[in-house]
Design a protein with these regions (language model features):
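Mixed-charge interfacial surface used for oligomerization/domain docking
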Residues: 4-168
C-alpha cells in the first residue's frame, strides 16, 4: 500500500525496529541490518490454552479437545513466519524449563544476547520469566513487551513468548 501511494520512493516493510536507524545509518544499511537480525531470531511461545486457536480454525477441534482435557501447554517455535510445534508440557513451569533449554541450545557463545519476553495479559509471569532469563544467561539486552492485539486475538490471554538473537 505505501509503495503504491509513494511511487518513486523506496519503501521496505520490516517486522522489527532497528538500532541502526537511530544511529543515523542510510536506508539500505538499516534494511540490511534488520534482515540480518530477523534471520537469526529464535522465538518460542507457550500457549496456555488451544481454545482460541480452535475457535479461529487454526487448530483442529479434536486436538484442542485432547490437549485441554490433559491440560497440555503446547510450545510453538516461530521461524521465518511459520509456526512449528516443538514440544508439549503438562504444566506451565515445565513449559518454561523446556523453552529455557531450547533457547540455551541455540545461543551462540561469545556474541551479545538480545532477549524479549512477550506476553498477552501475563505481566507477572513475564516478570518471572525475565528474572529466570537474567539469572541464567548473560544478556546484552533484556526486555518485556506485549503481544500485538492481532496475536492476542488468535491465542487469547495467557500466551507468553521468548524471542532472542545473538549478535550486534
Amino acid at each position: 500500500m505505501a509503495r503504491e501511494v509513494l511511487s518513486g520512493v523506496l519503501v521496505e516493510v520490516l517486522d522489527s525496529q532497528v538500532a541502526a536507524a537511530a544511529a543515523g545509518k542510510k536506508m539500505n544499511e538499516v534494511i540490511n541490518a534488520a534482515k540480518n537480525v530477523m534471520g537469526g531470531v529464535h522465538f518460542f511461545v507457550i500457549v496456555d490454552t488451544l481454545k482460541y486457536l480452535v475457535n479461529g480454525g487454526r487448530v483442529p477441534k479434536v486436538a484442542g479437545w485432547a490437549e485441554s482435557l490433559l491440560n497440555i501447554k503446547p510450545i510453538i517455535m516461530l521461524k521465518n513466519g511459520e509456526a512449528h510445534s516443538v514440544a508439549r508440557a503438562r504444566t506451565y513451569l515445565s513449559a518454561v524449563k523446556q523453552i529455557m533449554e531450547l533457547s540455551k541450545n541455540r545461543i551462540v557463545k561469545g556474541l551479545p544476547l538480545h532477549v524479549a519476553v512477550i506476553h498477552a495479559a501475563e505481566t507477572e509471569k513475564a516478570e518471572e520469566l525475565k528474572n529466570r532469563i537474567a539469572s541464567s544467561f548473560d544478556c546484552a539486552e533484556l526486555m518485556i513487551t506485549d503481544f500485538t492485539p492481532v496475536i492476542g486475538a488468535h491465542t487469547g490471554p495467557g500466551v507468553i513468548g521468548l524471542a532472542f538473537y545473538c549478535g550486534e
